[in-house]
Amino acid sequence: MNKALKVLLFSLLALSLFVVAACGSTEEPAEEAPASEENTEESTDEANDETNEEAALEETGELVVYSSRNENFVNALLEKFTADTGIEVKPLHAGDNAVSRIKGEAGNTQADIFISNDIGALENLRLEGLLEGSDPEGIESIDENYRADDNSWFALSARTRVLMYNKDLITEEEMPKSIEELTDPKWQGEFAITRGGNGGMIGHVSALRNEWGDEKTKEWIADVKDNAGAILEGHGDIRRAVGAGEFTFGLVNNYYYHQQLQEPTDNNVGVIYPDQGEGEMGAVVNAAGVGLVKDAPNAQSAQVFLDWILEEENQREFSYESLEVPINPEIEAVEGAATISDYKTHDMPLSQLGEVWEDTRELIEQAGLDLDL
């Protein structure tokens, strides 16, 4: 066979193979395309879900929590969070310095979550643009009166200002029934209060300013300071001193009374919820809660924490550890504790505490009560 014929035959063979291939093709792959795209979308959704679940761990694998609460009230809660989620917590128990630290780190945020013993401090941070709004799962379990408009903070447990007394030294009938009575000379040296910078004291004075005005409140602070037998670092110091009989009574948050009742000794104490009479202001209520710090470095971890803390069992853990009263009405208070619906309370909205928080600190100092010992 000559060379030209071979080329011709080879060309005809190639052409026939091309025709067969073309005729044998169908539109089926094109018809299956939508199903293929659907599978791809499902796979993408599943991948996104997995990514969201793992995102918190992929950021840094940790959560930085600043807290102004007693670390004994917080540590077990944070350990439970780590056990439940796998996210490691780096806590900073900064006491009253937590707020100033967050303010000082503005623009270089280190904290993700702030756990506060004072709603006024949380609202003050929000007003200064240092907290960030959120929509955590379960937020509807917290009444709107106990959370920011943008949910950047929310309360979890309530505490009320009370007079805890030693039953071996005084009877309930003999006890003062109003906060104003603490200026009476008859109580000179008989009671103890905290330093002015304590969160409970700041919130209490803010409520008195709302009720009485600044001048009367300043006079009350000065007179109570002079009348008190001691000014102590914190309420735990007061409750132990009252239980031991070092003072007849002390001005504390109500859960310290319940803590003293659980002591093996020095537990013969009683409690007075002040200003319950007709026309009186009612007992002053504050709350502890959590806030989402703006520009949190571990934003995904912070969101996981907010969702987690609003689960009912964790709300219970938050309040029961300190023997406070849960804000969520669906959670029963600890045995023997009065709920805020059981007594008359002052009507100042907690959200207003933040508006006057810094001014109240200044007024306390002006009245002569040191913020720190």
Where are the model-predicted features located?
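Ligand-binding pocket segment of bilobal, Venus flytrap-like solute-binding proteins
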Residues: A207-P274
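C-terminal motif of bacterial Sec signal peptides marking the signal peptidase cleavage site
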Residues: V19-A22
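Early extracytoplasmic/lumenal segment of secretory-pathway proteins
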Residues: A55-N124
